[in-house]
Protein backbone atom coordinates (compact mmCIF):
# COMPACT_ATOMS: atom_id res chain seq x y z
CA UNK A 1 0.00 0.00 0.00
CA UNK A 2 1.32 3.50 -0.83
CA UNK A 3 2.15 6.07 1.83
CA UNK A 4 -0.76 7.99 3.42
CA UNK A 5 -1.32 11.55 2.27
CA UNK A 6 -2.90 12.24 5.67
CA UNK A 7 -2.18 10.54 9.02
CA UNK A 8 -3.90 11.08 12.37
CA UNK A 9 -2.11 9.29 15.21
CA UNK A 10 -3.14 8.89 18.85
CA UNK A 11 -5.63 11.77 18.81
CA UNK A 12 -7.19 12.54 22.20
CA UNK A 13 -9.93 15.05 23.03
CA UNK A 14 -11.96 15.45 26.22
CA UNK A 15 -14.97 17.60 27.07
CA UNK A 16 -16.43 18.11 30.57
CA UNK A 17 -17.78 14.73 31.66
CA UNK A 18 -16.80 12.78 28.54
CA UNK A 19 -13.65 11.64 26.71
CA UNK A 20 -14.65 11.99 23.06
CA UNK A 21 -11.41 10.67 21.52
CA UNK A 22 -9.05 8.17 23.12
CA UNK A 23 -6.05 7.26 20.94
CA UNK A 24 -8.03 7.66 17.70
CA UNK A 25 -6.20 7.02 14.42
CA UNK A 26 -6.92 7.46 10.71
CA UNK A 27 -4.89 7.03 7.51
CA UNK A 28 -6.00 8.52 4.18
CA UNK A 29 -4.31 7.32 0.99
CA UNK A 30 -4.04 9.16 -2.35
CA UNK A 31 -6.40 7.76 -4.97
CA UNK A 32 -8.43 5.83 -2.39
CA UNK A 33 -11.73 6.22 -0.52
CA UNK A 34 -11.44 5.54 3.22
CA UNK A 35 -14.72 4.87 5.03
CA UNK A 36 -14.81 6.20 8.60
CA UNK A 37 -17.35 4.12 10.49
CA UNK A 38 -18.75 3.96 14.00
CA UNK A 39 -21.93 4.35 15.96
CA UNK A 40 -23.32 7.82 16.70
CA UNK A 41 -21.10 9.19 19.45
CA UNK A 42 -18.11 7.06 18.40
CA UNK A 43 -16.05 10.21 17.77
CA UNK A 44 -16.13 10.52 13.96
CA UNK A 45 -17.24 14.17 13.85
CA UNK A 46 -14.97 15.11 16.77
CA UNK A 47 -12.01 13.56 14.94
CA UNK A 48 -12.77 15.55 11.79
CA UNK A 49 -13.21 18.76 13.79
CA UNK A 50 -9.87 18.11 15.49
CA UNK A 51 -8.28 17.61 12.08
CA UNK A 52 -9.62 20.87 10.62
CA UNK A 53 -8.84 22.95 13.72
CA UNK A 54 -12.39 23.50 14.94
CA UNK A 55 -11.34 21.68 18.13
CA UNK A 56 -7.86 21.82 19.64
CA UNK A 57 -6.76 18.24 20.29
CA UNK A 58 -5.41 17.38 23.74
CA UNK A 59 -2.80 14.94 22.42
CA UNK A 60 -1.73 13.23 19.21
CA UNK A 61 -0.15 14.10 15.88
CA UNK A 62 -1.46 15.04 12.43
CA UNK A 63 0.81 14.58 9.41
CA UNK A 64 -0.17 15.89 5.97
CA UNK A 65 1.94 15.20 2.89
CA UNK A 66 4.66 13.87 5.20
CA UNK A 67 4.85 16.96 7.45
CA UNK A 68 3.46 17.55 10.95
CA UNK A 69 0.62 20.10 10.84
CA UNK A 70 -1.73 21.79 13.29
CA UNK A 71 -4.50 23.76 11.60
CA UNK A 72 -5.98 26.90 13.19
CA UNK A 73 -9.41 26.38 11.64
CA UNK A 74 -11.32 25.21 8.55
CA UNK A 75 -10.05 28.07 6.37
CA UNK A 76 -6.45 27.15 7.22
CA UNK A 77 -7.05 23.46 6.41
CA UNK A 78 -8.88 24.36 3.18
CA UNK A 79 -5.99 26.54 2.04
CA UNK A 80 -3.68 23.59 2.70
CA UNK A 81 -5.85 21.34 0.52
CA UNK A 82 -8.23 19.62 2.96
CA UNK A 83 -11.96 20.27 2.50
CA UNK A 84 -14.87 18.95 4.53
CA UNK A 85 -18.49 18.57 3.43
CA UNK A 86 -20.53 18.74 6.62
CA UNK A 87 -23.74 16.80 7.18
CA UNK A 88 -25.42 20.10 8.13
CA UNK A 89 -25.64 22.59 5.28
CA UNK A 90 -23.36 25.62 5.56
CA UNK A 91 -25.13 27.72 2.95
CA UNK A 92 -27.19 30.92 2.73
CA UNK A 93 -30.60 30.52 1.02
CA UNK A 94 -30.87 34.22 0.11
CA UNK A 95 -27.71 34.16 -2.03
CA UNK A 96 -27.27 32.66 -5.49
CA UNK A 97 -25.70 29.25 -5.99
CA UNK A 98 -22.49 30.85 -7.30
CA UNK A 99 -22.29 33.29 -4.39
CA UNK A 100 -22.57 30.37 -1.97
CA UNK A 101 -19.87 28.37 -3.73
CA UNK A 102 -17.36 31.25 -3.72
CA UNK A 103 -18.46 33.00 -0.50
CA UNK A 104 -15.51 34.76 1.12
CA UNK A 105 -13.19 34.15 -1.85
CA UNK A 106 -14.99 35.92 -4.68
CA UNK A 107 -13.04 36.38 -7.89
CA UNK A 108 -12.08 40.04 -8.29
CA UNK A 109 -10.32 42.23 -10.85
CA UNK A 110 -7.46 44.67 -10.27
CA UNK A 111 -9.91 47.33 -9.02
CA UNK A 112 -11.62 45.05 -6.48
CA UNK A 113 -14.71 44.49 -8.58
CA UNK A 114 -16.23 41.01 -8.66
CA UNK A 115 -15.74 39.12 -11.92
CA UNK A 116 -19.31 37.83 -12.05
CA UNK A 117 -19.14 36.22 -15.50
CA UNK A 118 -16.09 34.14 -14.56
CA UNK A 119 -17.61 33.16 -11.22
CA UNK A 120 -20.91 32.08 -12.76
CA UNK A 121 -19.10 30.16 -15.49
CA UNK A 122 -16.96 28.20 -13.02
CA UNK A 123 -19.97 27.54 -10.79
CA UNK A 124 -21.97 26.29 -13.79
CA UNK A 125 -19.12 23.92 -14.69
CA UNK A 126 -19.17 22.49 -11.15
CA UNK A 127 -22.96 22.04 -11.25
CA UNK A 128 -22.71 20.33 -14.63
CA UNK A 129 -20.08 17.96 -13.27
CA UNK A 130 -22.53 16.95 -10.51
CA UNK A 131 -25.45 16.76 -12.96
CA UNK A 132 -27.33 19.55 -11.15
CA UNK A 133 -29.78 21.01 -13.65
CA UNK A 134 -29.85 24.58 -12.32
CA UNK A 135 -28.10 27.80 -13.33
CA UNK A 136 -25.67 29.21 -10.79
CA UNK A 137 -27.50 32.57 -10.90
CA UNK A 138 -30.52 30.93 -9.23
CA UNK A 139 -31.17 31.58 -5.53
CA UNK A 140 -30.10 28.67 -3.37
CA UNK A 141 -33.36 28.79 -1.39
CA UNK A 142 -35.30 27.77 -4.50
CA UNK A 143 -33.57 24.36 -4.56
CA UNK A 144 -34.65 21.18 -2.80
CA UNK A 145 -32.70 19.95 0.23
CA UNK A 146 -30.95 17.32 -1.90
CA UNK A 147 -29.98 19.88 -4.55
CA UNK A 148 -28.62 22.18 -1.85
CA UNK A 149 -26.49 19.29 -0.61
CA UNK A 150 -25.09 18.95 -4.14
CA UNK A 151 -24.18 22.67 -4.04
CA UNK A 152 -22.35 22.02 -0.75
CA UNK A 153 -20.41 19.28 -2.55
CA UNK A 154 -19.72 21.61 -5.50
CA UNK A 155 -18.34 24.17 -3.04
CA UNK A 156 -15.87 21.61 -1.68
CA UNK A 157 -14.83 20.61 -5.22
CA UNK A 158 -14.12 24.26 -6.06
CA UNK A 159 -11.14 24.24 -3.65
CA UNK A 160 -9.36 21.61 -5.80
CA UNK A 161 -8.38 19.82 -2.58
CA UNK A 162 -5.99 16.90 -2.13
CA UNK A 163 -8.18 15.45 0.65
CA UNK A 164 -11.98 15.70 0.77
CA UNK A 165 -14.00 14.61 3.82
CA UNK A 166 -17.63 13.74 3.09
CA UNK A 167 -19.87 13.50 6.18
CA UNK A 168 -23.12 11.67 5.31
CA UNK A 169 -23.07 13.22 1.79
CA UNK A 170 -26.04 11.21 0.44
CA UNK A 171 -28.32 11.77 3.44
CA UNK A 172 -30.72 14.05 1.53
CA UNK A 173 -29.93 12.89 -2.02
CA UNK A 174 -32.14 10.99 -4.44
CA UNK A 175 -30.83 7.81 -6.06
CA UNK A 176 -30.02 9.76 -9.24
CA UNK A 177 -28.11 12.43 -7.28
CA UNK A 178 -26.23 9.70 -5.41
CA UNK A 179 -25.19 8.12 -8.72
CA UNK A 180 -23.89 11.52 -9.89
CA UNK A 181 -21.92 11.92 -6.66
CA UNK A 182 -20.38 8.44 -6.97
CA UNK A 183 -19.33 9.25 -10.54
CA UNK A 184 -17.49 12.33 -9.26
CA UNK A 185 -15.91 10.35 -6.40
CA UNK A 186 -14.55 7.86 -8.94
CA UNK A 187 -13.15 10.75 -11.00
CA UNK A 188 -11.49 12.26 -7.91
CA UNK A 189 -10.04 8.88 -7.00
CA UNK A 190 -8.57 8.55 -10.51
CA UNK A 191 -7.02 12.02 -10.11
CA UNK A 192 -5.24 10.90 -6.92
CA UNK A 193 -7.45 12.65 -4.40
CA UNK A 194 -7.78 11.04 -0.96
CA UNK A 195 -11.36 10.83 0.30
CA UNK A 196 -12.78 10.19 3.77
CA UNK A 197 -16.34 8.88 3.44
CA UNK A 198 -18.52 8.94 6.58
CA UNK A 199 -21.86 7.16 6.22
CA UNK A 200 -24.21 4.83 8.08
CA UNK A 201 -25.42 3.31 4.81
CA UNK A 202 -23.49 0.05 4.65
CA UNK A 203 -24.50 -0.60 1.05
CA UNK A 204 -22.73 2.62 -0.01
CA UNK A 205 -19.59 1.71 1.93
CA UNK A 206 -19.21 -1.58 0.07
CA UNK A 207 -20.03 0.09 -3.26
CA UNK A 208 -17.73 3.11 -3.26
CA UNK A 209 -15.00 2.66 -0.60
CA UNK A 210 -11.62 0.91 -0.75
CA UNK A 211 -10.80 0.67 2.97
CA UNK A 212 -12.62 1.04 6.29
CA UNK A 213 -11.50 2.57 9.60
CA UNK A 214 -13.73 1.90 12.63
CA UNK A 215 -14.00 3.97 15.83
CA UNK A 216 -15.87 2.87 18.94
CA UNK A 217 -16.24 5.04 22.06
CA UNK A 218 -13.54 7.35 20.70
CA UNK A 219 -11.02 4.53 20.27
CA UNK A 220 -9.41 3.17 17.10
CA UNK A 221 -10.75 -0.37 16.60
CA UNK A 222 -9.15 -1.27 13.30
CA UNK A 223 -8.52 -0.65 9.61
CA UNK A 224 -9.67 -3.16 6.99
CA UNK A 225 -9.81 -3.44 3.22
CA UNK A 226 -13.43 -3.50 2.03
CA UNK A 227 -12.65 -6.67 0.08
CA UNK A 228 -11.66 -8.42 3.33
CA UNK A 229 -14.81 -7.77 5.36
CA UNK A 230 -18.60 -8.14 5.19
CA UNK A 231 -21.59 -6.34 6.71
CA UNK A 232 -21.86 -8.59 9.77
CA UNK A 233 -18.16 -8.27 10.53
CA UNK A 234 -18.27 -4.50 10.09
CA UNK A 235 -21.29 -4.13 12.37
CA UNK A 236 -19.58 -6.24 15.03
CA UNK A 237 -16.51 -3.96 14.86
CA UNK A 238 -18.74 -0.89 15.22
CA UNK A 239 -20.97 -1.99 18.10
CA UNK A 240 -18.75 -4.56 19.81
CA UNK A 241 -21.33 -7.31 19.43
CA UNK A 242 -23.32 -9.07 16.72
CA UNK A 243 -26.81 -7.72 16.06
CA UNK A 244 -29.76 -10.03 15.55
CA UNK A 245 -32.24 -9.54 12.72
CA UNK A 246 -32.08 -6.05 11.28
CA UNK A 247 -35.81 -5.26 11.45
CA UNK A 248 -37.34 -6.80 14.62
CA UNK A 249 -41.01 -6.46 13.69
CA UNK A 250 -43.50 -7.86 16.19
CA UNK A 251 -47.08 -9.00 15.59
CA UNK A 252 -49.70 -7.24 17.71
CA UNK A 253 -53.47 -7.67 17.60
CA UNK A 254 -54.85 -4.44 16.17
CA UNK A 255 -57.54 -2.48 17.98
CA UNK A 256 -60.25 -0.23 16.60
CA UNK A 257 -59.58 2.40 13.94
CA UNK A 258 -57.79 5.34 15.53
CA UNK A 259 -57.16 7.67 12.57
CA UNK A 260 -59.30 7.93 9.45
CA UNK A 261 -58.41 10.26 6.58
CA UNK A 262 -60.96 10.73 3.78
CA UNK A 263 -60.45 12.56 0.47
CA UNK A 264 -57.81 14.81 2.00
CA UNK A 265 -56.50 17.58 -0.25
CA UNK A 266 -54.01 20.27 0.71
CA UNK A 267 -50.49 21.54 0.10
CA UNK A 268 -48.86 18.86 -2.09
CA UNK A 269 -51.63 16.33 -1.30
CA UNK A 270 -54.50 15.32 -3.60
CA UNK A 271 -57.56 13.27 -2.57
CA UNK A 272 -55.84 10.92 -0.10
CA UNK A 273 -57.76 8.39 2.00
CA UNK A 274 -56.51 5.78 4.50
CA UNK A 275 -57.19 4.28 7.93
CA UNK A 276 -54.88 3.50 10.83
CA UNK A 277 -55.73 1.09 13.67
CA UNK A 278 -54.52 1.02 17.26
CA UNK A 279 -51.37 -1.05 17.60
CA UNK A 280 -50.63 -0.79 13.87
CA UNK A 281 -47.59 0.54 12.03
CA UNK A 282 -48.53 2.06 8.68
CA UNK A 283 -45.53 2.49 6.39
CA UNK A 284 -45.52 5.34 3.87
CA UNK A 285 -43.19 4.88 0.89
CA UNK A 286 -42.50 6.89 -2.25
CA UNK A 287 -39.82 8.89 -4.02
CA UNK A 288 -38.60 12.31 -2.93
CA UNK A 289 -41.25 14.92 -3.76
CA UNK A 290 -44.10 12.37 -3.77
CA UNK A 291 -45.96 14.25 -1.02
CA UNK A 292 -45.28 11.94 1.94
CA UNK A 293 -44.08 14.62 4.36
CA UNK A 294 -46.67 17.07 3.06
CA UNK A 295 -49.46 14.58 3.85
CA UNK A 296 -48.17 14.15 7.39
CA UNK A 297 -47.92 17.92 7.89
CA UNK A 298 -51.48 18.48 6.67
CA UNK A 299 -52.74 15.86 9.15
CA UNK A 300 -50.67 17.46 11.92
CA UNK A 301 -51.71 21.02 11.07
CA UNK A 302 -48.35 22.32 9.85
CA UNK A 303 -49.65 22.71 6.27
CA UNK A 304 -53.02 23.95 5.07
CA UNK A 305 -55.89 21.53 4.44
CA UNK A 306 -58.16 22.56 1.56
CA UNK A 307 -60.79 19.81 1.73
CA UNK A 308 -61.44 16.34 3.08
CA UNK A 309 -61.98 14.93 6.57
CA UNK A 310 -59.70 13.78 9.38
CA UNK A 311 -61.22 11.69 12.18
CA UNK A 312 -59.46 10.71 15.39
CA UNK A 313 -61.21 8.05 17.46
CA UNK A 314 -64.36 8.65 15.44
CA UNK A 315 -64.45 12.42 15.99
CA UNK A 316 -63.76 14.94 13.22
CA UNK A 317 -60.78 17.19 13.92
CA UNK A 318 -59.61 20.31 12.11
CA UNK A 319 -55.92 20.96 12.85
CA UNK A 320 -54.81 24.28 11.37
CA UNK A 321 -51.64 24.68 13.44
CA UNK A 322 -49.14 22.22 14.97
CA UNK A 323 -50.54 23.20 18.37
CA UNK A 324 -53.91 21.86 17.20
CA UNK A 325 -52.26 18.61 16.15
CA UNK A 326 -50.62 18.19 19.56
CA UNK A 327 -53.84 19.09 21.37
CA UNK A 328 -55.69 16.43 19.36
CA UNK A 329 -53.12 13.79 20.31
CA UNK A 330 -50.96 13.70 17.16
CA UNK A 331 -47.17 13.92 17.49
CA UNK A 332 -45.10 14.56 14.36
CA UNK A 333 -41.34 13.89 14.38
CA UNK A 334 -39.95 15.89 11.45
CA UNK A 335 -37.52 14.51 8.86
CA UNK A 336 -35.44 17.66 9.47
CA UNK A 337 -34.67 17.28 13.16
CA UNK A 338 -32.24 20.21 13.22
CA UNK A 339 -34.42 22.60 11.22
CA UNK A 340 -37.87 21.76 12.61
CA UNK A 341 -37.51 19.26 15.44
CA UNK A 342 -34.91 20.64 17.84
CA UNK A 343 -33.53 23.92 19.16
CA UNK A 344 -29.80 23.23 19.03
CA UNK A 345 -28.88 25.98 21.50
CA UNK A 346 -31.12 24.59 24.26
CA UNK A 347 -30.43 21.68 26.59
CA UNK A 348 -31.61 18.09 26.30
CA UNK A 349 -34.17 18.75 29.05
CA UNK A 350 -35.50 21.96 27.49
CA UNK A 351 -35.86 20.34 24.06
CA UNK A 352 -37.53 17.20 25.36
CA UNK A 353 -40.17 19.04 27.39
CA UNK A 354 -40.76 21.85 24.88
CA UNK A 355 -44.09 20.50 23.56
CA UNK A 356 -45.29 19.33 27.00
CA UNK A 357 -45.00 22.53 29.03
CA UNK A 358 -48.77 22.88 29.34
CA UNK A 359 -49.09 19.34 30.71
CA UNK A 360 -46.16 19.95 33.07
CA UNK A 361 -47.53 23.23 34.43
CA UNK A 362 -50.02 24.24 37.09
CA UNK A 363 -51.39 27.59 36.04
CA UNK A 364 -48.36 29.62 35.01
CA UNK A 365 -45.99 27.65 37.25
CA UNK A 366 -43.86 24.90 35.68
CA UNK A 367 -43.68 21.78 37.84
CA UNK A 368 -39.90 21.36 37.67
CA UNK A 369 -39.75 18.08 39.60
CA UNK A 370 -42.22 16.42 37.22
CA UNK A 371 -40.34 17.82 34.21
CA UNK A 372 -36.97 16.51 35.44
CA UNK A 373 -38.46 13.13 36.38
CA UNK A 374 -40.07 12.69 32.95
CA UNK A 375 -36.89 13.75 31.12
CA UNK A 376 -34.68 11.41 33.18
CA UNK A 377 -37.11 8.54 32.54
CA UNK A 378 -36.87 9.06 28.76
CA UNK A 379 -33.07 9.41 28.88
CA UNK A 380 -32.93 5.97 30.54
CA UNK A 381 -35.62 4.42 28.33
CA UNK A 382 -34.00 5.65 25.11
CA UNK A 383 -30.43 5.04 26.30
CA UNK A 384 -29.54 8.63 25.35
CA UNK A 385 -25.80 9.20 25.72
CA UNK A 386 -25.43 12.60 27.38
CA UNK A 387 -23.29 13.70 30.36
CA UNK A 388 -26.32 15.39 31.96
CA UNK A 389 -29.86 16.42 31.06
CA UNK A 390 -28.56 20.02 30.92
CA UNK A 391 -26.10 19.29 28.09
CA UNK A 392 -26.65 21.55 25.05
CA UNK A 393 -28.29 19.27 22.49
CA UNK A 394 -26.14 20.59 19.64
CA UNK A 395 -23.19 18.85 21.31
CA UNK A 396 -24.81 15.40 21.07
CA UNK A 397 -24.32 12.95 18.21
CA UNK A 398 -26.96 12.71 15.48
CA UNK A 399 -28.40 9.45 16.80
CA UNK A 400 -28.81 10.83 20.31
CA UNK A 401 -30.37 14.02 18.93
CA UNK A 402 -32.87 11.86 17.04
CA UNK A 403 -33.75 9.95 20.20
CA UNK A 404 -34.43 13.26 21.98
CA UNK A 405 -36.65 14.38 19.07
CA UNK A 406 -38.72 11.18 19.33
CA UNK A 407 -38.88 11.43 23.13
CA UNK A 408 -40.08 15.02 22.77
CA UNK A 409 -43.07 13.80 20.77
CA UNK A 410 -43.79 10.92 23.15
CA UNK A 411 -43.79 13.19 26.20
CA UNK A 412 -47.03 14.66 24.85
CA UNK A 413 -48.62 11.17 25.27
CA UNK A 414 -49.96 11.04 21.71
CA UNK A 415 -52.62 8.74 20.28
CA UNK A 416 -50.91 8.85 16.87
CA UNK A 417 -47.13 9.02 16.45
CA UNK A 418 -45.87 10.13 13.02
CA UNK A 419 -42.21 9.30 12.42
CA UNK A 420 -40.82 11.01 9.30
CA UNK A 421 -37.44 9.46 8.37
CA UNK A 422 -36.77 8.45 12.01
CA UNK A 423 -33.44 6.72 11.30
CA UNK A 424 -31.95 9.17 8.79
CA UNK A 425 -28.28 9.75 9.65
CA UNK A 426 -28.45 7.20 12.48
CA UNK A 427 -25.98 4.33 12.91
CA UNK A 428 -26.98 0.66 12.86
CA UNK A 429 -26.86 0.25 16.64
CA UNK A 430 -29.05 3.30 17.29
CA UNK A 431 -31.40 2.18 14.49
CA UNK A 432 -31.93 -1.13 16.27
CA UNK A 433 -32.70 0.70 19.52
CA UNK A 434 -35.21 2.97 17.75
CA UNK A 435 -36.90 -0.05 16.13
CA UNK A 436 -37.20 -1.75 19.52
CA UNK A 437 -38.76 1.40 21.00
CA UNK A 438 -41.22 1.59 18.08
CA UNK A 439 -42.20 -2.02 18.80
CA UNK A 440 -42.69 -1.19 22.47
CA UNK A 441 -45.08 1.68 21.64
CA UNK A 442 -46.87 -0.56 19.15
CA UNK A 443 -47.34 -3.27 21.80
CA UNK A 444 -48.86 -0.64 24.10
CA UNK A 445 -51.50 0.08 21.46
CA UNK A 446 -50.12 3.28 19.96
CA UNK A 447 -50.94 4.01 16.31
CA UNK A 448 -47.76 4.71 14.33
CA UNK A 449 -47.09 6.10 10.85
CA UNK A 450 -43.58 5.36 9.57
CA UNK A 451 -42.45 7.53 6.64
CA UNK A 452 -39.16 6.35 5.15
CA UNK A 453 -37.13 6.55 1.95
CA UNK A 454 -35.50 3.23 2.85
CA UNK A 455 -37.75 0.54 1.37
CA UNK A 456 -36.20 -2.28 3.44
CA UNK A 457 -37.10 -0.30 6.58
CA UNK A 458 -40.70 0.18 5.47
CA UNK A 459 -41.01 -3.48 4.48
CA UNK A 460 -39.29 -4.70 7.63
CA UNK A 461 -41.17 -2.68 10.26
CA UNK A 462 -44.66 -2.00 8.84
CA UNK A 463 -47.88 -4.01 9.08
CA UNK A 464 -49.37 -2.27 6.06
CA UNK A 465 -47.84 0.05 3.46
CA UNK A 466 -49.17 2.85 1.29
CA UNK A 467 -47.12 4.25 -1.60
CA UNK A 468 -47.40 7.85 -2.78
CA UNK A 469 -46.81 9.37 -6.21
CA UNK A 470 -47.37 13.05 -7.08
CA UNK A 471 -49.47 13.70 -3.98
CA UNK A 472 -51.74 10.67 -4.37
CA UNK A 473 -51.78 7.13 -3.03
CA UNK A 474 -50.73 4.89 -5.92
CA UNK A 475 -50.63 1.61 -4.03
CA UNK A 476 -51.51 -0.15 -0.79
CA UNK A 477 -50.19 -3.50 0.43
CA UNK A 478 -50.14 -5.71 3.46
CA UNK A 479 -46.46 -6.02 4.39
CA UNK A 480 -46.51 -9.78 3.77
CA UNK A 481 -47.62 -9.18 0.16
CA UNK A 482 -45.16 -6.37 -0.61
CA UNK A 483 -41.63 -6.29 -1.97
CA UNK A 484 -39.25 -3.60 -3.22
CA UNK A 485 -40.24 -4.13 -6.86
CA UNK A 486 -43.93 -3.52 -6.11
CA UNK A 487 -43.22 -0.45 -3.99
CA UNK A 488 -40.92 1.04 -6.62
CA UNK A 489 -43.42 0.40 -9.42
CA UNK A 490 -46.11 2.29 -7.48
CA UNK A 491 -43.62 5.01 -6.55
CA UNK A 492 -43.05 5.82 -10.23
CA UNK A 493 -46.78 5.95 -10.96
CA UNK A 494 -48.10 2.43 -11.53
CA UNK A 495 -51.23 1.58 -9.56
CA UNK A 496 -51.65 -1.49 -7.37
CA UNK A 497 -53.91 -2.99 -10.07
CA UNK A 498 -51.23 -2.51 -12.74
CA UNK A 499 -48.71 -4.08 -10.37
CA UNK A 500 -50.93 -7.12 -9.94
CA UNK A 501 -51.38 -7.44 -13.72
CA UNK A 502 -47.60 -7.45 -14.19
CA UNK A 503 -47.18 -10.01 -11.40
CA UNK A 504 -49.83 -12.23 -12.98
Curated annotation (Swiss-Prot):
Signal peptide: none annotated. Residues 6-242, 252-495 form the ABC transporter domain. SMART domains: AAA (SM00382). One of its GO terms (cellular component) is plasma membrane. It catalyses: D-ribose(out) + ATP + H2O = D-ribose(in) + ADP + phosphate + H(+). It is an enzyme of class 7 (translocase). Its EC number is 7.5.2.7. Pfam families: ABC_tran (PF00005). SUPFAM superfamilies: P-loop containing nucleoside triphosphate hydrolases (SSF52540). It is found in: Cell inner membrane. CDD domains: ABC_Carb_Monos_I, ABC_Carb_Monos_II. InterPro entries: AAA+_ATPase, ABC_carbohydrate_import_ATPase, ABC_transporter-like_ATP-bd, ABC_transporter-like_CS, P-loop_NTPase. It is a peripheral membrane protein. GO terms for molecular function: ABC-type D-ribose transporter activity; ATP binding; ATP hydrolysis activity. ATP binds at residues 38-45. Keywords: ATP-binding, Cell inner membrane, Cell membrane, Membrane, Nucleotide-binding, Repeat, Sugar transport, Translocase, Transport. Transmembrane segments: none annotated. Part of the ABC transporter complex RbsABC involved in ribose import. Responsible for energy coupling to the transport system. Belongs to the ABC transporter superfamily. Ribose importer (TC 3.A.1.2.1) family. The complex is composed of an ATP-binding protein (RbsA), two transmembrane proteins (RbsC) and a solute-binding protein (RbsB). This is Ribose import ATP-binding protein RbsA. It comes from Photobacterium profundum (strain SS9).
